[in-house]
């Protein structure tokens, strides 16, 4: 509806920043994933994001809007309360212990993932709002830079920052469903195009 509403306006070609996700990629994929890798979503969420990317590119190509899509890494540490998203433990195992609360870890320590901080996410959007879109080109959906870290590395960083007592608040409760799901997620990216355009994690 939004894109069609924009199309219906005369002499109106706004910049549209679309929040996409690394969930547009599913197994099998190389590690790291290059910018040229095709979308292979394996979830409804990832499929919806991929559809959004295609629509954004098409409406941009037709001159209806000036689009740029940002494939965000998983944002960590997210503020607020834990939620039911399968990825929520990445923030929870840091945020909750730092607040003196117990956190559940449903996966193995060797799970790796692609992260960016809330501050970096804000920077991504500010940069996207002002970047010269001629430099972005026709492929207007970008995989953004981030930090590839394992759960073990997260816990080690927590211990360095807050001590062993804080780490002891992490309760290991293996969940085979979540672990299988998380192992199907991408772990690292080259993100060369976004870096060359000035996006920084």
Positions of PLM-derived features:
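Conserved Rossmann-fold NAD(P)-dependent oxidoreductase catalytic core, especially the SDR/UDP-sugar
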Residues: 1-42
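Conserved active-site helix of classical SDR/Rossmann-fold NAD(P)-dependent CH-OH oxidoreductases
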Residues: 3, 50-57, 90-91, 95, ...
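Active-site Tyr-X1-5-Lys
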Residues: 27-29, 42-68, 73, 98
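Short-chain dehydrogenase/reductase
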Residues: 31, 37, 42-50, 83-91, ...
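Glycine/proline-rich active-site loop of Rossmann-fold NAD(P)-dependent oxidoreductases
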Residues: 50, 77-91, 118, 128-141
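A conserved pocket-lining segment of Rossmann-fold NAD(P)-dependent short-chain dehydrogenase/reductase
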Residues: 72-83, 92-116
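Mid/C-terminal beta-alpha module of Rossmann-like enzyme folds, strongest
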Residues: 97, 124-179
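Conserved C-terminal active-site "lid" loop/helix of NAD(P)H-dependent oxidoreductases
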Residues: 118, 174-199
């Amino acid at each position: 509806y939004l894109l069609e509403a924009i199309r219906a306006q005369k002499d109106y070609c706004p910049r549209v920043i679309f929040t996409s996700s690394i969930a547009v990629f599913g197994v099998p994929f190389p590690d790291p994933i290059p910018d040229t890798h095709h979308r292979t979503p394996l979830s409804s969420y990832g499929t919806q994001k991929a559809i959004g990317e295609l629509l954004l590119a098409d409406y941009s190509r037709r001159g209806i809007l000036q689009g740029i899509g940002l494939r965000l890494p998983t944002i960590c540490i997210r503020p607020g309360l834990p939620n039911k998203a399968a990825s929520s433990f990445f923030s929870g195992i840091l945020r909750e212990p730092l607040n003196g609360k117990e956190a559940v870890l449903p996966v193995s320590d060797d799970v790796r993932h692609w992260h960016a901080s809330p501050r970096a996410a804000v920077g991504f959007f500010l940069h996207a709002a002002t970047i010269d879109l001629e430099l972005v080109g026709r492929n207007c959906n970008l995989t953004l830079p981030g930090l590839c870290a394992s759960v073990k590395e997260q816990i080690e960083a927590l211990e360095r920052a807050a001590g062993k007592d804080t780490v002891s608040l992490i309760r290991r409760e293996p969940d085979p469903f979540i672990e299988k799901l998380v192992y199907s997620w991408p772990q690292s990216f080259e993100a060369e195009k976004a870096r060359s355009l000035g996006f920084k994690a």
